[in-house]
UniProtKB/Swiss-Prot annotation:
It comes from the Bacteria. This is Small ribosomal subunit protein uS4. Part of the 30S ribosomal subunit. Contacts protein S5. The interaction surface between S4 and S5 is involved in control of translational fidelity. GO terms for biological process: ribosomal small subunit biogenesis; translation. One of its GO terms (molecular function) is rRNA binding. GO terms for cellular component: small ribosomal subunit. The lineage of its organism: Bacteria, Bacillati, Mycoplasmatota, Mollicutes, Entomoplasmatales.
Length: 208
């Protein structure tokens, strides 16, 4: 299944959920409660079944991290093999530990999609070595740096200037465009609008 590349705002509005986690998709006077379409479809949509709620939660988080269904499902399967902890939390921690997400959290890109492009194009170093795999699982203590040739890039400078992230599991040296994945995040540090229990229910039926 291909990765969605359409309008971020349109998709965010459909889910009533800020994909960028800062509400900027709704900053042009549009309300997040409005569903795309002529009049938000019909009101029956509000009375969602358990199956529908699970599917929607899975879809919105998959879109938030910019992953294909196969990538998302494989990450969940990996989370099921983690010993200890809560499955839903372990799953979110694996998503947060992706290299493209850490680049986004450090503020080197304004969106996860832009962060993924930086990684894909070889503009990111991990522990001093070029790494162009967005799904790479960054480990606590790993250092992440923008390649020297890109350190004067206007888009990266703009992203850093507008970065509003306050998460404490990463630290960034804005002057030198370097950062570190300090530790694994705690559940309360991650998006509290995500109902990971619904995603667990969805995939537990499919992955044994």
């Amino acid at each position: 299944m291909s990765r969605y590349t359409g309008s971020t705002f349109k998709k965010a509005r459909r889910y009533g959920f800020s994909i960028l986690e800062n509400g900027k998709e709704f900053s042009k006077g549009k309300k997040r409660v409005t569903t795309p379409g002529q009049h938000g479809k019909d009101k029956a949509r509000l009375k969602m079944s358990g199956y529908g709620a699970q599917l929607q939660e899975k879809q919105k988080v998959k879109f938030m991290y910019g992953m294909t269904e196969r990538q998302f499902r494989n990450t969940f399967a990996k989370a099921k093999k983690v010993h200890g902890g809560i499955l839903g939390t372990n799953f979110l921690v694996l998503l947060e530990s992706r290299l493209d997400n850490i680049v986004f959290r450090l503020g080197f890109a304004m969106t996860r999609q832009a962060a993924r492009q930086l990684v894909n194009h070889g503009h990111i170093l991990v522990n001093g070595k070029k790494l162009d795999i967005p799904s790479y699982q960054v480990k606590p203590g790993d250092s992440i740096e923008v390649k020297e040739a890109m350190k004067k890039n206007d888009k990266i400078a703009e992203a850093l200037q507008n970065n509003e992230s306050t998460v404490e599991f990463v630290k960034v040296d804005k002057a030198n465009l370097k950062g570190q994945f300090v530790r694994l995040p705690e559940r309360q540090e991650l998006n509290l609008e995500i109902n990971d229990a619904l995603i667990v229910e969805w995939y537990n039926r499919l992955i044994k």
